[in-house]
Amino acid sequence: MASTTPITMEDLQKALEAQSRALRAELAAGASQSRRPRPPRQRDSSTSGDDSGRDSGGPRRRRGNRGRGQLRDWSRAPPPPEERQESRSQTPAPKPSRAPPQQPQPPRMQTGRGGSAPRPELGPPTNPFQAAVARGLRPPLHDPDTEAPTEACVTSWLWSEGEGAVFYRVDLHFTNLGTPPLDEDGRWDPALMYNPCGPEPPAHVVRAYNQPAGDVRGVWGKGERTYAEQDFRVGGTRWHRLLRMPVRGLDGDSAPLPPHTTERIETRSARHPWRIRFGAPQAFLAGLLLAAVAVGTARAGLQPRADMAAPPTLPQPPRAHGQHYGHHHHQLPFLGHDGHHGGTLRVGQHHRNASDVLPGHWLQGGWGCYNLSDWHQGTHVCHTKHMDFWCVEHDRPPPATPTPFTTAANSTTAATPATAPAPCHAGLNDSCGGFLSGCGPMRLRHGADTRCGRLICGLSTTAQYPPTRFGCAMRWGLPPWELVVLTARPEDGWTCRGVPAHPGTRCPELVSPMGRATCSPASALWLATANALSLDHALAAFVLLVPWVLIFMVCRRACRRRGAAAALTAVVLQGYNPPAYGEEAFTYLCTAPGCATQTPVPVRLAGVRFESKIVDGGCFAPWDLEATGACICEIPTDVSCEGLGAWVPTAPCARIWNGTQRACTFWAVNAYSSGGYAQLASYFNPGGSYYKQYHPTACEVEPAFGHSDAACWGFPTDTVMSVFALASYVQHPHKTVRVKFHTETRTVWQLSVAGASCNVTTEHPFCNTPHGQLEVQVPPDPGDLVEYIMNYTGNQQSRWGLGSPNCHGPDWASPVCQRHSPDCSRLVGATPERPRLRLVDADDPLLRTAPGPGEVWVTPVIGSQARKCGLHIRAGPYGHATVEMPEWIHAHTTSDPWHPPGPLGLKFKTVRPVALPRALAPPRNVRVTGCYQCGTPALVEGLAPGGGNCHLTVNGEDVGAFPPGKFVTAALLNTPPPYQVSCGGESDRASARVIDPAAQSFTGVVYGTHTTAVSETRQTWAEWAAAHWWQLTLGAICALLLAGLLACCAKCLYYLRGAIAPR
């Protein structure tokens, strides 16, 4: 019978070491492994049963693989596959059965304090510690009353994709017997590593932890710790396991790698072959350093490449000003930097900012003039095609034969007379001929500006432009790069797609008679190859590739051992729940705020607002037509504001009297009556010259024979009544107009869908709601707007001008084509013509109509007392429609630019998709008004037929879709009339009132460069893809890289939640 002496841990350790030495000797001698014979019904190792030599009186727990009768040295590597197969094929020799050992008594464990403690029972385990001992694992050799070393208890991890991002933490002891053994099929037995020293995980986690798995996804090294990552399935659920591996075995040798690995790091290290020598932070920092060096030298190495020949020698135009203009030579302006981009203008000895004194279109490279002279002679600086002209006009007889001068073909300078210019010929139909040097219609300060159709003869001068310089616009390394014109000399002739280049122009390629210029990396690389690979172009290619190399390094480092596709599918695709559509309902919603309608859910228009970029255009004071007068029952001696002070208001009379181009008239009514002043009637000749000798006045004196003097009732018929009227255009002190430009306007419609707010625009006309998707037929945005904030005698209101003005056409004198002063003190536009005064009787049928433009009607009114009468004054519209007047602003503007003429179409998608009906009949009463091929949209209005939405086409061009009813839209027209309109069915002819661009131009005026805008062309997707193949390829690469990065980030965040708070 076996001894019942208590077994200590030291005795157990010595026995295990002796057994290990015996096994090593046996394996060294080449002896085969001995196996304990089993009954035939118990050959299967997976079944549990009693051994043949064990007594049936008491069960015995097997200890790991030793319970199967297999002995193996765990501190050494497993035998090769050939030897393992050979050993399995041999039949083991039978051995005599051993006597069943007695059930051992509970041993005594050394406590280190001279005492002993009962050893755990080796029977059925009752706790995790006993279960670990029963599996053959021991606690580490240390004093249990002292603190365990760091390596005594380590942490491994498990997580399952079926349970979400939930991590399970398993704390266990290391076995110090080396690498864990293998089963007979060559798989690991993780149960031999399970020796928990922390809380017992749930049963399904323990079952997953003990699941055998031979595939290893990777071996991770961090400091002195090593982990093996595995993934496997348990009952259809995919699990991930991260196991802590021992660093050294009992005999001091390094632990070998597991035999079944699917990936192995090839980077070598002297100590740990599978460790990574350099991690991602070092590689990423090195890449950032290279990128910083490359970008830092990009400005020096990246220069636009111009493939050009030697520039031709251009003759300089002469600067002859003539002997008669020597006193004006010191006033010639000289542009400091770029005149059309805010340069300086020298007037006399003073330098002023060009933006303060020049018209607005001067700065935009258009046409304009600036008056530098006094009232007696017109001296102007004119600007057109980014060139400056010095124009002088005075009363000197013209020379007999002027000699014109024409510059070289490559120069854009206009013709310049070699001699002093002469004034224009008399007559409005004459022109300056060879004397014209680019000066256009002047706006002079004196009234004698009626010669040559307002064309002023003059000299042309040019300033010395700086040489043409280019720069490259880098956009984060994304092709194509653009060429930026820093300074431009017009004589060089650089153009971008046929349009002359100006400072600030951005273009992929510039062309001139001297060659081409580009910043494209492909062209730069080609030119670099042709020029023996110069350093600057090689550096350009390197800078282009560095960002993509860094992205590739980061993506490869982040995604090399993570399932990017699975994580992207799980996080991105599974996280998006598209709305389920059902029936389609279509209705309309009025555009007034507060309107509501009922689709499957109630929809209400909460409000309308628009967003834009605002640029202040200054302020101006509009011209104001003001008139006053008096009705007197006698002929006054002094017909003026002073002489008529008792009948005429003093303030308006003085304001009108001091105005420009005033009209003042005095009428004598019933002058041929007997007595009194009747003898003066013979002196009322048409000019009233004799009357002026006795009654000094600045007014015109005219008789008014035939008018009734009933206004002065209660007098004899021989009395004489006089009427005095005064009118002029003045600057009203309480009327101002401020101009603001709105660009990139976008209308935002604020809807309330079943209580949920939703904003729709032309870019995003959809609303995703819990009830379905709402699609809104949003009218097009108004485009560029001009806001006129008019403050007339304290009553402020805003008017809106649609579209950008045509400053090179009929809008050259409009408010938006001027640069106004901030203090609203500038009067804009040409000086108004003199108003016309007319005396009209009270019963004249003419009073049933309205006064004509520039007319003022004066009517005497009978007073309520004797010798008392009054005047009724009616003023007509202004006599010049191209000048800034309140009526001009009201005629060319609207009060609500973003209010569409028709309702909003609402399409609500809810169960059975149905196709929306489309109108197949032609629209009715379609009218087209505007201009074609001029870059500005024309107005198209009419009535859409019923039966569904009308997809309107004008001469084959798609204009838009409109619901049944009245529609108003704007469209760019490329063809002249007639216009055929259709809604998908038969076409009908529309009435048209359009003009071409030639009808908008002035004769004899030189304009700046402008392009003709056309409507958007139609092309197929294949044509579009062929034209943008490079952008599509680059976009696909960027999308793949971005998807990989997002997948890595999503998966990291997905698992980080469970790693921070494991269960």
Swiss-Prot record:
Changing P101T: In strain: Isolate RVI/CAL.USA/91, Isolate RVI/PAN/99 and Isolate RVI/SLV/02. Changing P94S: In strain: Isolate RVI/SLV/02. InterPro entries: Rubella_Capsid (IPR008819), Rubella_Capsid_sf (IPR043106), Rubella_E1 (IPR008820), Rubella_E1_1 (IPR042500), Rubella_E1_2 (IPR042498), Rubella_E1_3 (IPR042499), Rubella_E2 (IPR008821). Changing A1039T: In strain: Isolate RVI/CAL.USA/97, Isolate RVI/MYS/01Isolate RVI/SAITAMA.JPN/94, Isolate RVI/SHANDONG.CHN/02 and Isolate RVI/TOKOYO.JPN/90. Residues 563-582 are annotated as: Functions as E1 signal peptide. Changing Q377L: In strain: Isolate RVI/ISR/75. Changing S97A: In strain: Isolate RVI/ISR/88 and Isolate RVI/SLV/02. Residues 556-582 are cytoplasmic. Changing R497H: In strain: Isolate RVI/ISR/79 and Isolate RVI/ISR/88. Changing A426T: In strain: Isolate RVI/ISR/88. Residues 1-131 are annotated as: Disordered. Residues 279-300 are annotated as: Functions as E2 signal peptide. Structural polyprotein: Contains two internal signal peptides that are necessary for directing translocation of the glycoproteins into the lumen of the endoplasmic reticulum. This is Structural polyprotein. It comes from Rubella virus (strain TO-336) (RUBV).
